[in-house]
């Protein structure tokens, strides 16, 4: 299963030749009010160490797929864990995450009896929780996009997270998420790009609250460590 995710990354890189992976479209004005940092070390491996914005940590992850009756039924599941410490985390925070999804393919039509669902809990940050799920089709019309929507809750703050499928210069949206945008109070405050081997995060230049920068970092790490079956 590890090979499947690595292959997807190679395709993403190779498809763009020497110019690198496709960049996701950012919300209007977001680049002007954020600073870009990278999540180094959390590429395609199953475990290792990472660095982001002066913080460091270690991660591990796994994913599997069970096909029954020649893909009539397919069960995807996986889990991940990371611990981060540093200037934004005086007390280390450990995240434990897991996802599940069941799909069914009849001829060329794919159904999802159990839709994608991903959840993270956090030790060291009381009450924090992240839930990401497959989004309901707009207007009830299904598309090829594996759209995701979610919420991160921490100390009374609520952030909404939504997947982005449009690439800069692209003509049609991609099926798998290129990355995610983080919103709060109806305003986009951050984003994380996942296409390629080094996730790129846009952090708020002037966080609205003391914990906002920390929360955005946790959201980004929780997304970067996920092996989404849509990217298979």
Feature map (PLM): residue ranges:
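C-terminal motif of bacterial Sec signal peptides marking the signal peptidase cleavage site
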Residues: 13-15
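Intrinsically disordered, low-complexity proline/glycine-rich segments
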Residues: 17-232
